[in-house]
């Protein structure tokens, strides 16, 4: 099993950080690269002419490696919302069809379609959170529902951000392909941790940022665009998205036809000297460890926590329907009325744990625990002991 990588991070022993699904800490290597990059921007005359392009292509290749894509199929973007807006501009959603989204999915893969539905004549259908936590069956039932309008698109996360609910994207993708529907995957909480092979899966779009599981900075994200969509018009019109629009040319607009691959969809002002290399380092580290090894380690930690809390009245999704790296705890039936707890998470519980140097997140009335490779068994045991003590009063 992959060992704890704590020594690669600025992680004090008395800090128990279990909130990587919000923000992951930066590895020491990434911090060093960021400091060097600030110095580089301070002395721009030292930059080699090809430096920026090298940074772009290094990041593009690192992102592609995580999902088994070709680098030419990856666009550099600043956020998931930017990527979804790009996909929405490229796609034609037929009138009278449905766009499938998840209840309380993050805003990016949802709101774009609500905004466009009226003008474009399609309906947005929300798949409600299933009582048994089985998102895959619920999504498939919505796609396959007899008598419903055809599905034009499913725009969903592969792992639900709030509780780690896992969607089997291979099963969903197959059902969509059989109906000629498009598939957009927000892989924010799966890229680098869960194996994804776009060659086999054949989605239309896959998006992910670096600031959570990929150990990178905020503001760097990536968009996979299937080749069948690479003739689309980009969200922004840039010189570098065209074949030959260069300041060095005698004729500036020498060839304004678009690049033939996903590079045409790169964001404007992509020369982020400081954060682009930082993003590359985190993605490269994740790829070197391997998604299977990372998932195995994090499953060990979340299972250790779940097992340690048995008998304390908290609920957690069944292992079969949750991602290995996120554990969500519910407090609906604590049975501690004599302690003044009402149904739901006790008030001040998250804040109280933080006073002990233990960091988790409140999400939709539940507690979300999200360890990463810097965590170890001592962190898991410390969290269990602290939470158990507070629940006992």
Spans of model-derived segments:
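Pyridoxal 5′-phosphate
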Residues: 1-393
